[in-house]
Amino acid sequence: MIKTAIKIFLLAVATSFSFLLFSPPPKSFYYSLYISTALSDNVSVSQHLQTLTRRPHVAGSEANAEAAAYVLSVLTSCNIKSHIASYAVSLTYPVSRSLSLTLLPTFHGYGKSGTAKGPVVYVNYGRVEDYVTLEEMGVNVSGSVVLARYGEIYRGDIVHNAFEAGAIGALIYTDRKDFGGGSGDARWFPDDKWMPPSGVQVGSVYDGVGDPTTPGWASTEGCERISNEEVEKTGDVPLIPSLPIPSQDGHIIMRSIEGQVANQDWQGDKDAPIYRTGPGPGVVNLSYKVRRTYHCNNPKCNWCHYREEEPDRFVILGNHRDAWTFGAVDPNSGTAALLEVTQRLEKMQKRGWKPRRTILLCNWDAEEYGLIGSTEWVEENREMLASRVVTYLNVDSAVHGAGFHASATPQLDELLKQATLQVQDPDNSSQTIYESWVGSSNSPVIGRLGGGGSDYAAFVQHIGIPAVDMSFGKGHPVYHSMYDDFVWMEKFGDLLFQRHVAVASVWGLVALRLADEEFLPFNYLSYACELQKSAKDLEDEVSGKGISLNPLFKSIEELTKAATKINNEKQAINKAKGWASIWKKDHSKVRELNDRLMMAERAFTDRDGLFGRTWYKHLIYAPSKHNDYGSRSFPGIQDAVEEANNLKTAESWLTVQHEVWRVSRAVNHVSLVLNGELT
């Protein structure tokens, strides 16, 4: 009996020693390796960017196909299974365009074909409130061509607001006050970072997402399509012609305008002419003709090792490739960072790293026209993605300048903070990115993903997938112009390409933790706190209107309890582990808990979507109705409040109350998912 016991004991010791001797390094080893200088390569990043930006490569062009081939070649050279998914989407290109006072062959994607001749009215940034100001001044916009400046809202909303005000055409220019480095002895590119007076910001004026001829379904070959006339009825494309123009032409037109002097906050820099509202007497002739074509390619690759754990759970990294011009900042700084991530992962693979979950790398096309490549792919794969994707990690323009910026769905806030604590600030070697990001505050400012500005939109706002978006710097003066090239990046954006390397480090580190950790690093307590803040803000907006927010506050309270409970469950499972976990792990329990964490975000969506904007299913985050770039919390409630304030009827406020109940039910559904119990 004693001999048997000794044999068993010796066997246990030997087996344990063997396990320790031959077990792979801990995940933390690979995390440190990933962000080390041994794997990062700023020279390679620079070479990627230089190759990608040799030619302007708008979506559907031969140059963009070459850029796609380059991305694919890098991915395949890393021994990753890669492929291209193609979609036949409707894109527009200029056939002819003319405007007295301007010569540059610039255009608006999905701009309306047509001509417009009329007196000019200056409308500041073209916001709804700017038209209210003009109305109060007695300025009639009807029948005019408006002159607006970039800077506050999405250009498509500028054109839409002009149409709603009765204008017959729209010109949008880049004012030196906003993009040209100010006045006096100001310098511009190539001597400084600022947009030259000849610079033109091009872009799309489409207010929707995805191919406008296939709303809600994928643009596959031979699929159903709605007609151009039906597209116009949706209100997502402009109904008046528009053109972007440079500041030098904007000022020439401005000098032709008389009438009342515009308000002080509508004026330009001190060297600009006096800005007046008009109308006229200057009259402009604007004509624009487009052709449509069908084209789109999305190179994608899988990085996966099928093991016994969770190969059917996906962590997706995405960036778009197409650019209006050379695209050194937007978007190919992000593309170069994506390729840097890929090459680091290959080096880690050679050192024994294997992910627990599948990592999927995507390089989207036609983002600039309206998030088209990512949206079509999401629409085609909706059910699979909804059931299997853990998180979508987006980087659009990786580097604009200095300073780290991030936006996320709130359950990922803590993970972002932890990742930035591990990566050195490229502009201050004595600090981590987190320390520079926080600055003098107690906590970093993390934005939210309600705006429609990049490829996270379909993942978050349509399906309800947790997501992150990140960059260094926020906005750059040569945005969407011919000056967004490699020289600008090398001189003013990232001299040594260390910011690119830092973005790749944070991006990949977040992905590694999501792909490798046994428990998904989600914390829904952050979500509950964020909803509480948003509800408090909403309380001020509906004060005295007879609206009860009690259902909303109660649902948030339940979410706090559910988030606390699932956090405690994770701790209990970890606490119960020990040497026994070497022999047997309860994989089903871990899997079930992770599924609850993954699926909870989906419960914030509603199958009916937002009223009048049914593609947007997420009831917590969606774009502002009058600014596609603007992020709103509780967008359905906010839309209803805006409508009620305009209509001033009891029935309209009942609609607000209904929207409050809808959001409250969604928050309760999230709590049920986290609790993992049927009612």
Enumerate the predicted regions with their spans:
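Metal-dependent peptidase/peptidase-like ectodomains
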Residues: 193-261, 312, 364-490, 496-500, ...
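Noncatalytic luminal/extracellular "stalk/propeptide" segments of secretory-pathway proteins
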Residues: 24-34, 38, 50-145, 150-152, ...
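C-terminal amphipathic alpha-helical interaction region
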Residues: 586, 590-679
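Structural recognition of the beta-strand scaffold that forms the well-ordered cores
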Residues: 48-51, 84, 120-123, 145-149, ...
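Soluble metallo-hydrolase cores and metallopeptidase-like ectodomains found primarily
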Residues: 101-133, 207-328, 343, 348-351
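Second-shell loop/turn segments in exported
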Residues: 32-39, 53-62, 106-111, 122, ...
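Alpha-helical metal-binding/catalytic segments enriched in His/Glu/Asp
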Residues: 317-371, 376, 507
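His/Asp/Glu-rich mid-to-C-terminal helical/loop segments that flank catalytic regions of hydrolases
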Residues: 360, 476-534, 645-679
